Amino acid sequence: MKEIIIANMMRTKNKQSFFALHQIQSKIQSLYSDIKIEFHILWDNKDEYNDINDKWEKLINSEIKNLYSYDRKFFVDYVKNLYDLDYENKFNTWPPIYHIIMPHYIRRVLCKDYYLIYDDDILINDNFDHIVKLVLNKIPVLISEPMNTNCDKVLINKLIDIFGEGFLTAYKNRNPEFKGFNAGFQGIDLSIYDDFLSKDRFKFLLDLFEYKSIFDQNGNEIWGNERFIIDTQQQSFFGLMNVVFSKKEPCILDENEYFVVPNWGVHPKFGEINHEDENNGWGIGLKSKITHFIGHTHGKGKPKVFLNKVDEYLLKNNFEL
C-alpha cells in the first residue's frame, strides 16, 4: 500500500490543529482512498488543554487516522539514548531544533524515505492532486516566497564551508534563480539525513545551529535581523539541503499558482499589499493554491480571515464550533 508521511510540531490539540489535520486527510482521501496517511506530530504545549480544547482533542483522536503523537521528552531521550548526547538545555533555548530531530528519527528509526512537513496555519485552496502525485513519487516539493528570497539562506555560508564550493554549484543548477522556499509546507527527501546518522555526524548536525532564545537577557523579545536569523535556521536547513542532496530533481512549484507571502509589502506580480483592506492584507496570499499564514505579519495571533476560513470549513463538514 502506498503511504504518505506527514509530520510537524504543533502547539496543542485544539481547533486549529484539528482543522489542519482533517483538511489534508480529507483532501488526500478524496483523491486516493487506498493511500495510507500517517501523521507524526510533536505536541508542544499540553498545558494549554482546557474544556474547549478537550473537545477538539477527542475529535483528533477519533477522526484522524494513523496519528502518532510525541512530546519534547521523547526526542530528548532519543538523542540521549541513541547518541549519548545531552542537549536538553540547548533544545529548550531554541525549540525549533525539534523540527530537525523529528525527521532524523523518522529516517533512522522508522526507515521512511520521504515526508511532507505541514503547518497548522495553511489553507489548501485547490483539489491538491498535483501535490499528492509529487508526494507519492517522492519528489521534493518546494513553494517559494517571492517577496523574500533570503528566507532560507542563513545557513548557506556554513554549508558551503562544510561541503565545499560543489554545494553552491549544485544549488545553482537546481535553483538558478536562488528562490527562497518556505518550510511550513515542503515535501522532503529524507535521504538528506543519511550523512548524519553516525554519532559524530549527528553531533555535527546539532552543532550546525545556534541555540539562541528569542528573548534577550532582560526578557525583552528580540526583533529585526537577529530574530530573522534565529527563526529561519531550520527553514534554511530544509530549503538548502533538500535542493542539493535530494535524489530526485525537486519540483519548484509555479510561482504564479503557488506562493507564500506576508500581509504587507509589494508582490512582484500583484503589486502593493494593503494590510488595512477587508482581508487585513491577505487577499493576495489567498490567490495562491496553498495559503500559509506566516508569522511575520502585522498584528498578533492568527488573522481573522484565517480563523473565519477555519470555522467555515468545520461547519461545512458538520463539526460544531
Language-model segments: which ranges?
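Short, charged/polar "capping" segments at the starts of alpha-helices
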Residues: 14-17, 45-55, 151-152
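Short, acidic, metal-binding catalytic loop of nucleotide-sugar glycosyltransferases
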Residues: 24-35
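GT-A fold catalytic core of metal-dependent nucleotide-sugar glycosyltransferases
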Residues: 69, 99-153, 188
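Short, flexible, basic/aromatic active-site loop/helix in glycosyltransferases
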Residues: 160-177
